[in-house]
Design a protein with these regions (language model features):
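Domain-edge interaction signal
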Residues: 2-191
Length: 191
């Protein structure tokens, strides 16, 4: 059934003359990491918060005890670190030890090539929404500038407000990879 829906959407987009693309999880992370002149992203949790707050996020999230979490995003970050696209460094920022994620030289090249290839196209998000890539880039940059480098507690206050407004159920049965993520957030997020 979803193949039929996707074919129908593709047909409509093509008839409208819209050149569209779909992005992989790694490409979404790449676009966020490259935003704001490729400034480092402070804290792994920042990736999760930004994509959680982004209304057109391609990732599925659940709310853990102290932060939103996406297993898909977690796996993308690991693959990008393992593949040499992202570099992780430990830094002291405002007297706190944190992880800083930035694009490697290879990652910067991949980012520039991707951005040039897709800039004038539309992106199909979650097989539902079509957005101009230029808008997506601007939105990700705005979110990065707004939330990157914020203390975890300030982001948690935002999350709590979002949770209260959207009636999320807190899931207390955690899997091992979720527990590992929480440990990293607590260690490097200043909790």
């Amino acid at each position: 059934m979803s193949t039929v829906n996707n074919e129908w959407k593709k047909s409509v987009l093509e008839k409208a003359g819209l050149q569209y693309i779909t992005l992989t999880g790694e490409e979404w992370v790449l676009l966020l990491a490259g935003a704001d002149s490729s400034s480092p992203i402070l804290g792994e949790y920042t990736f999760h918060f930004i994509f959680f707050l982004y209304p057109f996020s391609p990732f599925n999230f659940k709310t853990l005890l102290i932060a939103p979490y996406s297993e898909q995003l977690d796996k993308c970050l690991k693959r990008m670190l393992d593949g040499g696209i992202l570099i992780k460094e430990i830094k002291v920022v405002n007297t706190m030890v944190t992880e800083a994620y930035k694009l490697s030289l290879k990652g910067n090249t991949v980012y520039r090539n991707l951005k040039n290839k897709i800039y004038k196209k539309q992106v199909l998000i979650n097989n539902h929404i079509v957005r101009p890539v230029a808008n997506v880039l601007n939105e990700l940059e705005s979110l990065k500038k707004t939330y990157n480098g914020r203390e975890l507690f300030k982001l948690l206050a935002l999350l709590i407000a979002k949770v209260k407004n959207n009636d999320f159920a807190l899931e207390l049965r955690l899997q091992d990879h979720e527990i590992q993520y929480l440990k990293r957030v607590i260690r490097y997020g200043g909790v």
